[in-house]
Amino acid sequence: MNFQKGEIIAIDKPYRMSSFKALAHVRYLLSHALHHKVKIGHAGTLDPLATGVLVLCTGKCTKQIEQLQTHTKEYTATLQLGATTASYDLEHEVNATYPTEHITRQLVEEVLHQFEGDIEQVPPTYSAVKVNGDRAYALRRAGEEVQLKPKN
């Protein structure tokens, strides 16, 4: 492998590790093994509580990052129906619960179909989206209100 010329690497990002920290760790390992600094970037981010494929590009392949981000993605999730948190994930405690008796497999499948294809969604305020140079989740953790625009 020629990391200076450019390689595309897929890693399984660990739970509770930021995408940046995962990238920094791989950069350190490569630079240490090769005895020189390696240019490296990631094609998209995963939230710290998410695990899964993080695509890393080295050397001249970093120029392909924007194009790689246009590819379709598929997600799987484990969730608790009838409970909400401030961050929509396990980072915060459950702050409200709702009845779930009416929820059927058919209803879940119908709702999931609404998330297929080209859709617009407002990201959660506890997300990695940048707002005036700062991550939305950092602003929220500092107690600031965040208004995010829908993304495709």
Where are the regions that the model predicts?
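Catalytic/RNA-binding core of pseudouridine synthases
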Residues: 1-152
